[in-house]
Amino acid sequence: MDTQDIVSEISELNLTYLMLAQQMLAKDRDAALFRLGISEELADILLTMSPAQIVKLASTNMMLCRFRFDDHAILGLVTQPHRDKGLQQSQMSILLARQAVEQIS
């Protein structure tokens, strides 16, 4: 895979992510804020963006979404086998909920 292919894949991922984020925010704002890990301010901006603005933002060569697994405890919950999947998901949700939301810098 060459550099241009990677940039194209990143743009496609960005577009999908932004469109999904808008849909999630429109359907259930509180759940979307939690799941996306974004601030109210960023949510407001995403909801008011036009399709042309979404496409333009998605066209960057940098990924707009990121892994929220900065904490080794969260990554451990995902990678280690657990007998109780419900408990595993609950623990992960609690750990993710403690993380600060993304702010616009």
Curated annotation (Swiss-Prot):
Keyword set includes Coiled coil: no
GO cellular component assignments: cytoplasm
Superkingdom, natural source: Bacteria
UniProt GO molecular function: DNA binding
KW Transcription regulation (keyword) present: yes
Keywords: Activator, Bacterial flagellum biogenesis, Cytoplasm, Disulfide bond, DNA-binding, Transcription, Transcription regulation
Pfam families: FlhD
BP terms from Gene Ontology: bacterial-type flagellum assembly; positive regulation of DNA-templated transcription; regulation of bacterial-type flagellum assembly
Localization per record: Cytoplasm
Subunit record text: Homodimer; disulfide-linked. Forms a heterohexamer composed of two FlhC and four FlhD subunits. Each FlhC binds a FlhD dimer, forming a heterotrimer, and a hexamer assembles by dimerization of two heterotrimers.
Function recorded in the entry: Functions in complex with FlhC as a master transcriptional regulator that regulates transcription of several flagellar and non-flagellar operons by binding to their promoter region. Activates expression of class 2 flagellar genes, including fliA, which is a flagellum-specific sigma factor that turns on the class 3 genes. Also regulates genes whose products function in a variety of physiological pathways.
Domain statement: The C-terminal region contains a putative helix-turn-helix (HTH) motif, suggesting that this region may bind DNA.
Family: Belongs to the FlhD family.
Protein name, as recorded: Flagellar transcriptional regulator FlhD
Species this chain originates from: Ralstonia pickettii (strain 12J)
Lineage: Bacteria, Pseudomonadati, Pseudomonadota, Betaproteobacteria, Burkholderiales
